[in-house]
C-alpha cells in the first residue's frame, strides 16, 4: 500500500494502516497513553453484564448494535472516537458501545479482534458487517448502510 508504519505509536497515514495498533505494539505506545472518556449516546462496556444488557436491548427492540473495540493507547482508536460519538448522536435507532480490548481481552479475542479499532455491526446478535482500522469515511459509510437497512425493514 505504500504506507510505512513507524510503530511509535502509529502510522503516518492512520486511516489505512492497521498494523501499528495490534497488541504487540502496545508497550511502545503506552508512553503516549491519554485518557479519553465516552459521553452521551456511546455506552462503555467493561463488564460482561453490561454487554448482555446492551445486546438484549438491541435484540428486543430490533436495533443494530455497533461495537467499537478500542485500545486506550491506540492513536486510530482515539482519532475515530469523535466521529463514532457523532454517529451515535445521529443514528439514534442504533445502539453504540465501546469495549476496551484490554478490559475484556478474552471477549475481544472471541470476536477475532486482532487490531484496533475494530467496529462490528450486529443485528439479532449476528455480525452483519465489520470494519478494521481507523478509516472514518468507511465507518460513516457502513453506519449509514446499516441505518438504511433498518429503515427498509420498518
Curated annotation (Swiss-Prot):
Database matches in PROSITE patterns: THIOREDOXIN_2 (PS51352)
Residues that bear Phosphoserine: 31
One GO cellular component term: cytosol
Tissue: Ubiquitous.
Subcellular location(s) per record: Cytoplasm
Principal location class: cytoplasm
GO molecular function: protein disulfide isomerase activity
Gene3D superfamilies: Glutaredoxin
Domain Thioredoxin residue range list: 23-148
Key words, A-Z: Cytoplasm, Isomerase, Phosphoprotein
Family, similarity comment: Belongs to the thioredoxin family.
Function noted in UniProt: Possesses low disulfide reductase activity, but efficient protein disulfide isomerase activity. Does not possess deglutathionylation activity.
PANTHER family associated with the record: THIOREDOXIN, THIOREDOXIN-LIKE PROTEIN CXXS2-RELATED
Protein name: Thioredoxin-like protein CXXS2
Species in which this protein is naturally found: Arabidopsis thaliana (Mouse-ear cress)
